[in-house]
């Protein structure tokens, strides 16, 4: 296994790769859907044990997928998980747990809902972690509305008259910043006095 380039004078060797891929869709029935996949691999052979066979370099330690379908209000209509590769056979016992999220709304308090509905020992850490980028992908998927061709990225929100969910969510979208003042002046506040 080749060494990676030096960083600040230290040589390094790749030991683990986690890949996360999320894709968002608009379905014919009007629901928005996200598919998310998490794959963990190692660049070296892992010995067999009584739970699984030997893993060759690049074989997945985890290969976990989830799918969520929501409506325009972000209410969850469908939620499912599949696990093609796990370190232990008991891991797949948690696949049905995402169904507990059906009927819930994604928005403020979502992380607490996930903790309450899925918990720690009834769920899978990696599956719960995958919900984060999956939900972010849903927001990005829905941001242009259902007829996005030719629109700029904010046109749908600007035309709705409603305060977009992302205002106040980061430095660029702070209410006292120049971007909100320019794009959504009705939601802008005066900049705070600086010392």
Tell what function each PLM region has.
Residues 1-45:
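Short, Gly/Pro- and small/polar-rich lid/capping loops
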């Amino acid at each position: 296994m080749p060494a990676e380039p030096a960083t600040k004078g230290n040589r390094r060797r790749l030991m683990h790769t986690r890949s996360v891929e999320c894709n968002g869709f608009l379905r014919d029935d009007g629901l928005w859907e996200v598919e998310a996949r998490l794959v963990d691999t190692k660049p070296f052979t892992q010995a067999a044990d009584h739970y699984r066979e030997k893993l060759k370099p690049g074989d997945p330690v985890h290969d976990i997928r989830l799918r969520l379908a929501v409506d325009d209000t972000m209410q969850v209509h469908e939620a499912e998980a599949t696990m093609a590769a796990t370190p232990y056979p008991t891991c797949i016992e948690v696949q049905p747990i995402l169904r507990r999220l059906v009927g819930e709304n994604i928005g403020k308090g979502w992380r607490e809902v996930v903790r309450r509905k899925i918990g720690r020992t009834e769920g899978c850490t990696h599956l719960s972690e995958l919900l984060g980028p999956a939900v972010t992908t849903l927001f990005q998927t829905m941001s242009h509305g259902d007829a996005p061709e030719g629109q700029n990225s904010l046109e749908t929100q600007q035309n709705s008259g409603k305060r977009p969910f992302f205002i106040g969510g980061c430095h660029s979208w702070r209410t006292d910043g120049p971007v909100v003042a320019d794009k959504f002046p009705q939601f802008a506040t005066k900049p705070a006095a600086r010392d």
